Structure formats: C-alpha cells, structure tokens
C-alpha cells in the first residue's frame, strides 16, 4: 500500500511539473508572453543567452540570418542575467528580432537542463527537444531543416 501511495504521489508531482510548463512568462520588457513548451503551436528555437557572454554576442548576427531562413519557427530568447536591465540593454542595442524571456533564477532553464551559455534548444511541435547545443554544430542546421521540411 505504501508503494502504491508513493507511486501516486510521484506521478502527481510529475503531472504538476509538466502542467506548470504551460504558462505566461515575463519578457525583458515586462510584457507577458504565453507559450506552452509541452505543445507549442509550431517548432521553437530557444536561445539561452546572457549579456556578459561574449560567445552569445557573437552568435546574434548568425541567428538573425537563421531566423530569416526559417521564419516558420517561433524564435525566443531566454536571458539568464541576474539583472534583467542588462539583458534589456543588449536587446535594444543589438535590435534582437525575437522576444526574450527573463529567467534570472533559471526556472525555465532548469526544466531544459541548461548548463551554460550560449545554448540553443530546438523543440518540435510536440514539445520534444530535438536539438541542444551551439549554432556552430552542423546538427543545429540539420534540425532546423528537418523540422522545416515536416511543416
């Protein structure tokens, strides 16, 4: 009986954590952004970045080009700065064409098992992470092309 109770508790905790992944989030400009990471309306490219990350800044022009090549995706930044104002400043100065969610406590980042910046995560429309890594990896482009062909 204890084993069944433990199983039911663990299962309900899992369901709660999955359900809580469909939320309204706050952008760097304090706007509300709604997305269900479990079942997004279309594939998502999640760009995990920070203003102090030199590699992140180097990626921006390349990612802007990828966005032009793949407008059928939802492109979304995940800024992990402790001070969101630093992220806001970069977003404006570099004219980022995608909104960025503010995640200073890595609440979203932890759900995606983010361990550093820059990290790119590509989700299919079922919410499965089909790619996790850096843009310089050939697999990133392959993941975009594969999902694009499935659209």
Q: What are the functions of these language-model segments?
A:
Residues 1-8:
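Bacterial N-terminal signal peptides that target proteins for export
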Residues 24-44:
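A short beta-strand-turn-helix
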Residues 41-44, 48-52, 116:
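Short pre-active-site segment immediately N-terminal to redox-active cysteine/selenocysteine motifs
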Residues 48-65:
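Conserved redox-active cysteine motifs that mediate thiol-disulfide chemistry
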Residues 58, 65-105, 117:
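Conserved segment of the thioredoxin-like fold in thiol-based oxidoreductases
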Residues 45-46, 75, 120:
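Hydrophobic beta-strand anchors of alpha/beta hydrolase catalytic cores
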């Amino acid at each position: 009986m204890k084993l069944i109770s433990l199983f039911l508790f663990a299962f309900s905790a899992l369901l709660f954590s999955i359900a809580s992944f469909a939320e309204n989030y706050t952008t760097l400009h304090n706007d509300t952004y709604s997305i269900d990471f479990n079942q997004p309306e279309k594939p998502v490219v999640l760009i995990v970045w920070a203003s102090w990350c030199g590699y992140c800044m180097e990626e921006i022009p390349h990612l802007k080009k990828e966005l032009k090549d793949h407008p059928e995706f939802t492109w979304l930044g995940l800024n992990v700065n402790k001070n969101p104002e630093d992220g806001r400043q970069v977003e404006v100065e570099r004219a980022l064409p995608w909104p960025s969610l503010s995640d200073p406590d890595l609440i979203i980042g932890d759900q995606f098992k983010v361990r550093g910046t820059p990290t790119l995560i590509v989700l299919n429309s079922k919410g499965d992470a089909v790619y996790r890594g850096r843009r310089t990896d050939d697999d990133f482009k392959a993941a975009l092309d594969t999902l694009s062909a499935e659209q």
